[in-house]
Each structure stands twice: as structure tokens, then as C-alpha cells.
UniProtKB/Swiss-Prot annotation:
Belongs to the p53 family. GO terms for molecular function: chromatin binding; damaged DNA binding; DNA binding; DNA-binding transcription activator activity, RNA polymerase II-specific; identical protein binding; MDM2/MDM4 family protein binding; metal ion binding; p53 binding. It comes from Mus musculus (Mouse). This is Tumor protein 63. There is a cross-link at K676 (Glycyl lysine isopeptide (Lys-Gly) (interchain with G-Cter in SUMO)). The lineage of its organism: Eukaryota, Metazoa, Chordata, Craniata, Vertebrata.
Amino acid sequence: MNFETSRCATLQYCPDPYIQRFIETPAHFSWKESYYRSAMSQSTQTSEFLSPEVFQHIWDFLEQPICSVQPIELNFVDEPSENGATNKIEISMDCIRMQDSDLSDPMWPQYTNLGLLNSMDQQIQNGSSSTSPYNTDHAQNSVTAPSPYAQPSSTFDALSPSPAIPSNTDYPGPHSFDVSFQQSSTAKSATWTYSTELKKLYCQIAKTCPIQIKVMTPPPQGAVIRAMPVYKKAEHVTEVVKRCPNHELSREFNEGQIAPPSHLIRVEGNSHAQYVEDPITGRQSVLVPYEPPQVGTEFTTVLYNFMCNSSCVGGMNRRPILIIVTLETRDGQVLGRRCFEARICACPGRDRKADEDSIRKQQVSDSAKNGDGTKRPFRQNTHGIQMTSIKKRRSPDDELLYLPVRGRETYEMLLKIKESLELMQYLPQHTIETYRQQQQQQHQHLLQKQTSMQSQSSYGNSSPPLNKMNSMNKLPSVSQLINPQQRNALTPTTMPEGMGANIPMMGTHMPMAGDMNGLSPTQALPPPLSMPSTSHCTPPPPYPTDCSIVSFLARLGCSSCLDYFTTQGLTTIYQIEHYSMDDLASLKIPEQFRHAIWKGILDHRQLHDFSSPPHLLRTPSGASTVSVGSSETRGERVIDAVRFTLRQTISFPPRDEWNDFNFDMDSRRNKQQRIKEEGE
């Protein structure tokens, strides 16, 4: 900003002490300070919010940003006579944009919200760091769980204990990670088979078992697939699954192999496989790089071999194991997890069939015990004579009856009734009693609501006295009929010019005195306005849809006090929202219910106290205003800062020329002194 030179002595006047930072020319400061020194005198919190420390922190965190400055200058000079006193006002506005394409800093999301800048400044002053508030999309795409069995990459990582028990919970993750198997045979000659019913894999030792890996979205570059065996039962889960000493020390399956002899799981046909043993927990796993599926396929196939039988002594020793397959990043963060049980045996088809038959028999026996609850038939042998079991005569409730039905609609209705009656037999008695009590309460509530509607219509037809107009039949205002989110959008600070003419509420028919009294419970109000909210605050909680006195007292547990209100013509909560404790006492409400109703009225008032915050902050002198915004475009960090500066310069002539302009201050002082003496 250039200043014109004057032969007159210059005295700079600042209307606000906070503006004094802007009086010196930018040459007196560094480039950063000259553009980021700001002041706000609205409140202590506001001044701290835009303090130089905050801008310095933003500048440091942006490292080397790309800045663009758009200066706007306005000058006003009041010079009535030549070489006389002048009054010059200069207004400057700098629109500064800082942007950076680096999004690796986790603190960046804090600068994308205007309200969070204040909390950041407080955290800086307190010497503490705050966590970044991630939104839903960011959490789904970026937040990943750390690997519980990742190798430590530094001394610090090695000092932190790894979990001794890896998680076996299925987790599809952000990429919908899934593991499946091909169509398998149950023949005895099959080398492997998978039971979807038991979620269990049966395979022979050292035989190839293909596993299909599927993701909906491609994982990040360098992702790997890890396979790790763990014991299934809780008493064995802390032990590491390894091969038995017999197979580990044998030459069979070990000669010419890259995999260590103690590893149970091996990968076949992949030279990039890496066998890992955690130095802390000792758990063994195998890693292969993730490869996208080939053209025309949905899956990525990995060939695994299991190098020890489940029945080997010294190894698994007939203890069931689980295979945990995870999709991880190169630094060990888990992107997805799948788990299935495995059994390595000599005849997979036979063992699968035996296990499935055993499970089915167990399910049938359990259902029989839960169904009739009868004991086993009684058999008795005496003197060599075998007594046959006497079958119970089937009770009428166990008979199967058939009812011919005509029409699909009638059949489906009867089918629902049949299923409901059968399901009711499996419910405990206390659940049924609770359901019946709830139905009775709802029935009583409906009856009270109907009576209140009738009384409301009767009071609406008669005209109340003039002295009771403020307390009787007070209809809700238009702002109360509009839902709270739209009410925030219709505030004077956010409604654009000319918006009132386009509001549908003004053009539609609003139910007034007669319409509101005749409004039935099933009749809906006009549809809500679909107006975008310009407030950046969280919208208030929704108001209760039923604003009648009946529902209000029912929520407070004071339904017995309904008559005190209906006798005075009070049917909606809007008629009592401004009541005080004395007003409730005048209604002769018992004292034990009076405090509860008063608290409910206060809670109802708080729902109406939400308003959109001002978008323009001003200082008391109006001299300096700073607004900060932020935006993110195409993965870049952008911070917009606008600085307003007001400078007023008053120029006076030299002291020896003051007499020409009636600026003789000594004569003025003498005159005031003489007036003071005469007054005394």
C-alpha cells in the first residue's frame, strides 16, 4: 500500500488497539507475518481463534504452500483546504488462498471446519494434540485395523507386546474381502472337500487345496494375503500350531523346499511366497502378494498345502484348528479377514460325511427334546420276558389336520396365522405377558387420545371469553409447524433475498382455527419444505410428532393429571410452553406431579432455542474483520483467508502555522482558565 508524502507532520490514529498490528508497513514484518497477523475483539475466544499463533501453525503445517493474493484497496481523503488538516481513511482487503496437495497429515481434517479451528487453537495453547474427526466416507476408506501379528519394523515396535491371540472374527473390510472354495466332491477318493454347512475344510496331507480370494474394490498397491493356523478351543489357543517332530525331521516333503520344515501351511506355485515367524509370539504364517483376477474371472486363486495330519502325536494331536486368511497392506494393517476350520486327514470325503451326519442327528435330537419334552421309552426285562415299549397315544394337539383353502390370498393369510401360532409356542411365558401388557397400555392410550380429540372439537366450536384468549385454544405458530431443520434454514441471516415469495408454505392452505380442530390423527400436515440448510452447525433433535397434552403427560408419567388441563381447554403443549410454576399451581395440579411437568416444559423450551450462528463476526469498533474458510478440491488442501484493514491518518500542519487555522492551543487554555476563575 503506497502513501503519498506530505510536508505536514503525520499522526496516525487507531480506533482500536488491536488494529495497531496493521499500522506498520509490511516491510517491517516478514512475508508470513504481514499477511497472517489478524485481530478480533468480539470476545476473548474469538481473538484467540484468529491469533497469529494459529496462522503460524497453519503455515508450518502447510510446509511450502502455493499462495495467491488478491489485494483490494479503497482510499477516502477529506482535504478542505491546501496545507490544512486532512483526514485520510484507507481500507484494504487481502484475499489469500493457500493450497497444498499433500494429504498425509492427519491433522488436516481439523482445518476443513470453521468451528474446529477454535478447538485446535485451544489445544495448541494447552500443549496437547487433538485427534482428527473423520467422517463416514473417510472411515470406510482409510481407517484400518492394525495387524495383531505383523512383524516389528523397529526397536520401538518390538518393545510393544503383540497380541497372543489373533482375532478369528470375519471382517469383510472396506474392500468386501471374501474367501471361497470351488465345487468339491464328497467321494472317498477326493483329496480335499469343503463343507459349507460346517464351514470346515477337509484335505489330505501335502495335497494342493485351491482357495479363491475375492474383493469388490482393488486394495492398495503392495497388499498381501496372509494365512495363519491357530487352535480353535480356548484351552489350546495360546499354543503355536506347528508340524509334529516326525514330519518336521523327515526328508519327505522337506527336500528341495524353501519353506521352513516347522511351518504347517505352504504355498505352491508362487515364488514370491514369504514365510514369517513372529519373534514375539512365535506364530508362523505365510504371505503372498495380492494379484488381481485375470480377465474373465472374479477370483484370485492361491494354492495351499497342509503338511501335517490333525491326528499326529506331538503336533496338533487331534486338536481342531482354524485357518485365518487376512488381506493386509504392506505395513501390516488388516483390510479384511476370513476364518474357517481345517482338518487334515487320510480320507476327507468320509470324515466330512460323518461329521455332517453327526450334526444332523444332534439337531434332530435337540429339536425333539425342545418340542415334546418326553423321556426315552421305558424298557424292563423280568424273568427273561422282554416288555415292549408302550407308545403314548397321540394327543389331539399333535394331530396333523388339513384344511382346503381356495384362493392364494386367503392361503397366505392363514399361513401367517399358522406360523405365528407355532412361533408362540417357543416364546417364554414372561415374554408373552410383557407383550400383552404393552398391548393393553397402547389400547388405553388410544382411548384417552380419542376422548381428548372429542373434547378438543367441543372446545373449538365454542368461543372462549376474551380474557382467556391467551390461554385457551392457542394454535401453534407457523414456525412451530415447520420442522426444526427448515426453521434454521429460514432464519434472516441465511434466507436469500426474494426467497419469501417462493416458499410453498405461503401459497398453500394453512389449517386455521376450524381446520386444526377438525384435524384427525390420520390426516397429515402439508409436506415439509425441501430447502437446503446453510448452517454448518449440527441440526437440533427432531420435535415430537404428537404435540398433544395427552402424549406429553404420558411421556412424563403424569397421565392422571389430564383432567386439570382439559377442563381449562388446554389440549396442546404449545398452549402451556410459557407456563410457570405458579401457573401450574393455579391449575390445582398435585405437588408430586407439578415438578415433573415443569421439567418437561423446560425440556420442550430447549428444543426451540436452536438458531443458526452468525456468519459475519464484527468487532465493537467495526475496524477489523477476518473470516477464514476452507475447501478441498480434487485431493488438495485449500485454506482461504480474508483480511480487512482500516487505517485512519489525520495530518496536522506544523505548530508554527496553527494560528492561521485557529489551532492556538495556549490561548484556548488561558481562556478556559479565565472562565473557570470567573465561575469560582
